[in-house]
């Protein structure tokens, strides 16, 4: 199994290193035969001798083209003759490539920016992470002593915790009497002990949570200050900091540094990405948070250190558990795109598609298009096109709703209509499909590069799903599931890749044709469903729709929906297929992207309504949840309105307990960097003035008091609120918390703010908003 690949330099020549695990043992293989190269397209092949003479200079050394080779390739499907220009060292490429490009005989150069080690994997057909090796995983986390305003790395590391499949432990340098705590004499000894543990346990994968930005850089700073070499690489090297776009990434040679933060922010959508929030979202279990000021206070006073140690140990344990949860999918993506796990776990979906295409282009003898220049990139950013169709919802409360959607709409369109840069407006084509509204033509005489690859991916996914049904082995079933999910993620990213401004195979015409066909097919479904089957379509968004038959019985609606699916699929071309996705007992649609439905088991699905961020008070969240439940479970909008009025009345009468009023916001930067002073910053500054250490990442809970002046001046720490001394600002909580939360729902039924605040009789047709068609 290939874990990673890089190259070193020996006597001026590059040497590829493959970091591998075979039969349970780690080894490094070397290849001294692979040479860097670029492609050049010449106006006149007889000028190659002139091109061969082009030289450059690097570190005082003359850089030359050491060999050339004429090769027959394809470019966007068309035959092309190019020259392969070999160089001595990968670092010679940036030195000489522009001189080659500017030569009068050269039309253009290609594939000059593919990193050498990645090029090796592609050309040799090697796939990282393939094989059945058992990988050793170790997670770690650090706790530091931080005081407000201190520069990064100034305060000591006070604890290093680590976890693997056998244990979770903490190393520290103050006496803490707990079975999982190891006490050493100093910070220096703690770091050295941690290095020994890494060497003893010899993990293949080191898991961190934000280790690229925090744990590793902090560890490196402290180690440098204390005169320690962080030799944790399997070749005896120290961690290497690299720039990837706007971020720093840390590489450990021979061990895969798997930073969960990048993977999780790409994979799941959460209001906040603290370790605690992520752990609770994934496992459904809360994890205690101990804040920086509490850690500092405990360390400096020597009190409550057991709590800090437990928190540190649980951090490492949580990181390990999350690693086990997310690694299998990333390993499958690594295999799928053929690049190392370290890179894949830090890649956007656009980059994953690109690495997949680069490998497939090489296999099909295609020269890859170049990345855009800065000027071209800016031009692409300015381009726009019409997206998917969204129908304004039919407002009110509806019953017996079916949800129908297209199976992989955009990938199916790309394959069915052969939408690809190499088939676009192809001269001499006899058969082509014309995109509706936009008019772009796609040739059907030859299979397009991207549609054919996408077709193979979807075929493979279908085979895997069949195999999943057949296999009796639960482990195999889990692994197959990760594989099909990886394929789905990649396949669904191709449409977005066409419009990705940095893409090599960028194609705005392709992207806008895909959405145009998408609009055509969903509108066809809408028309046929209403005109021929008597449904009323309530809401459409891109590839799916909600519909009902007003006054219809639930079983009749389900039956007719299934009949319609069979009917429409016989009319749809190619791979396009509509599916019956679900039945909902009740639902309402407020505006585009904002709706809620409840299924027959009582499961509520909402979009665009829920207030999950922590800067909403508990009273706002609780009231919204009660309103949702009353409408969806009981079908009673008027009761929901009564609940809101009751809560508003209780707020006005100061009957709401303070714990339901606290608003929580995170401090995201040092206090002196804030220009706009929000309530949480104002409270944090008051705490800092009292000597409390405020650190980025801390969450401040505050309550807004009654009075004059800006809200920031009237916010106090939630824990300091005393009902005997303080009065909360009822008007603030009514206007800025409860009403905005419930109006997200109730405005869909024609209610306005003033209808909820005051006991007025509604004169105008409430029933016209409800539209309840009882079955």
Curated annotation (Swiss-Prot):
It comes from the Archaea. GO terms for molecular function: DNA binding; DNA-directed DNA polymerase activity; endonuclease activity; nucleotide binding. Keywords: DNA replication, DNA-binding, DNA-directed DNA polymerase, Endonuclease, Hydrolase, Nuclease, Nucleotidyltransferase, Transferase. Its EC number is 2.7.7.7. Gene3D superfamilies: DNA polymerase family B, C-terminal domain, DNA Polymerase, chain B, domain 1, Helix hairpin bin, Palm domain of DNA polymerase, Ribonuclease H-like superfamily/Ribonuclease H. Because Pfu DNA polymerase exhibits the lowest error rate of any thermostable DNA polymerase studied, it is routinely used for PCR. It is sold by a number of companies including Promega, Stratagene and ThermoScientific. Various mutations to improve its abilities have been incorporated. It is an enzyme of class 2 (transferase). One of its GO terms (biological process) is DNA-templated DNA replication. An 11-mer corresponding to the PIP-box of RfcL inhibits DNA synthesis. It catalyses: DNA(n) + a 2'-deoxyribonucleoside 5'-triphosphate = DNA(n+1) + diphosphate. Coiled coil: none annotated. SUPFAM superfamilies: DNA/RNA polymerases (SSF56672), Ribonuclease H-like (SSF53098). The keyword Transferase applies. SMART domains: POLBc. Belongs to the DNA polymerase type-B family. Monomer. In addition to polymerase activity, this DNA polymerase exhibits 3' to 5' exonuclease activity. This is DNA polymerase. It comes from Pyrococcus furiosus (strain ATCC 43587 / DSM 3638 / JCM 8422 / Vc1). The lineage of its organism: Archaea, Methanobacteriati, Methanobacteriota, Thermococci, Thermococcales.
């Amino acid at each position: 199994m290939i874990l990673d690949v890089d190259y070193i330099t020996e006597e001026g020549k590059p040497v590829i290193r493959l970091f591998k695990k075979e039969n349970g043992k780690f080894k490094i293989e070397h290849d001294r035969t692979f040479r860097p190269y670029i492609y050049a397209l010449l106006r006149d092949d007889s000028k190659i001798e002139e091109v061969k003479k082009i030289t450059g200079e690097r570190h005082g050394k003359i850089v030359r083209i050491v060999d050339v080779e004429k090769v027959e390739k394809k470019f966007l499907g068309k035959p092309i003759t190019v020259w392969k220009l070999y160089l001595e060292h990968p670092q010679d490429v940036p030195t000489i490539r522009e001189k080659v490009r500017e030569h009068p005989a050269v039309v253009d150069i290609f594939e000059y920016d593919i990193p050498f080690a990645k090029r090796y994997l592609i050309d040799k057909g090697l796939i990282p992470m393939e094989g059945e090796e058992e990988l050793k995983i170790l997670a770690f986390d650090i706790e530091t002593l931080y005081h407000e305003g201190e520069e990064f790395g100034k305060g000591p590391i006070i604890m290093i915790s680590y976890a693997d499949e056998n244990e979770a432990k903490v190393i520290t340098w103050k006496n803490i009497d707990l079975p999982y705590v190891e006490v050493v004499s100093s910070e220096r000894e703690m770091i050295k002990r941690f290095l020994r543990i890494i060497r003893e346990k010899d993990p293949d994968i080191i898991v961190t949570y934000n280790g690229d930005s925090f744990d590793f850089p902090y560890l490196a700073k402290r180690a440098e200050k204390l005169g320690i070499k962080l030799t944790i690489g399997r070749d005896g090297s120290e961690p290497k900091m690299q720039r990837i776009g706007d971020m720093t990434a840390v590489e450990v040679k021979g061990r895969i540094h798997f930073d969960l933060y990048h993977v999780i922010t790409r994979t799941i959508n959460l209001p906040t990405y603290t370790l605690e929030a992520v752990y609770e979202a994934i496992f459904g279990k809360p994890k205690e948070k101990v804040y920086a000021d509490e850690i500092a206070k405990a360390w400096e006073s020597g009190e409550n250190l057991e709590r800090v140690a437990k928190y540190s140990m649980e951090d490492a344990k949580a990181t390990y558990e999350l690693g086990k949860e997310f690694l299998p999918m990333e390993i499958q993506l690594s295999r799928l795109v053929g690049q190392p796990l370290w890179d894949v776990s830090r890649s956007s979906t656009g980059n994953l598609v690109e690495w997949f295409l680069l490998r497939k282009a090489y296999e099909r003898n295609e020269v890859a298009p170049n990345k855009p220049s800065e000027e071209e990139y800016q031009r692409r950013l300015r381009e726009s096109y019409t997206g998917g169709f969204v129908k304004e919802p039919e407002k009110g409360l509806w019953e017996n709703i079916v949800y129908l959607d297209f199976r992989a709409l955009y990938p199916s369109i790309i394959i069915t209509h052969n939408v690809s840069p190499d088939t676009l407006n192809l001269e001499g084509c006899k058969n082509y499909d014309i995109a509706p509204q936009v008019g772009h033509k796609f040739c059907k005489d030859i299979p397009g590069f991207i549609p054919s690859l996408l077709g193979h991916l979807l075929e493979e996914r279908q085979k895997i799903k069949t195999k999943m049904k057949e296999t009796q082995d639960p482990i195999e079933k889990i692994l197959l599931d990760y594989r099909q999910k990886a394929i789905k993620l990649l396949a669904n990213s191709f449409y977005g890749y066409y419009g990705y401004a940095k893409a090599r195979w960028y194609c705005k015409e392709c992207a806008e044709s895909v959405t145009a066909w998408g609009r055509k097919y969903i509108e066809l479904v809408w028309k046929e469903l209403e005109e021929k089957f008597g449904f009323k379509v309530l809401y459409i968004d891109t590839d799916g729709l909600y519909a009902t038959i007003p006054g219809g019985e639930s079983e009749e609606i389900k039956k007719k929906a299934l009949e319609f699916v069979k009917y429409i699929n016989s009319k749809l071309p190619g791979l396009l297929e509509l599916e019956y996705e679900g039945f909902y007992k009740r639902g309402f649609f407020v505006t585009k992207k904002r709706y809620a439905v409840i299924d027959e088991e009582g499961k509520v699905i909402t979009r665009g309504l829920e207030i999950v961020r922590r800067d909403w008070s508990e009273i706002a969240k609780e009231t919204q949840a009660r309103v949702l439940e009353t409408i969806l479970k009981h079908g009673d909008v008027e009761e929901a309105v009564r609940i809101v009025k009751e809560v508003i009345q209780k707020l006005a009468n100061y009957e709401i307990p303070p714990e339901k009023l606290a608003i929580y916001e995170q401090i995201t930067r040092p206090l002196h960097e804030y220009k706009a002073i929000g309530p949480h910053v104002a409270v944090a500054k008051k705490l800092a003035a009292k000597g409390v250490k405020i650190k980025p990442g801390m969450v401040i809970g505050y309550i807004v008091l009654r009075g004059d002046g800006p809200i920031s001046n009237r916010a106090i720490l939630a824990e300091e609120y005393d009902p005997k001394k303080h009065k909360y600002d009822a008007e603030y909580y009514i206007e800025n918390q409860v009403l905005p939360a419930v109006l997200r729902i109730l405005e869909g039924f024609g209610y306005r703010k003033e209808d909820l605040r005051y006991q007025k009789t509604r004169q105008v047709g409430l029933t016209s908003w409800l539209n309840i068609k009882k079955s």
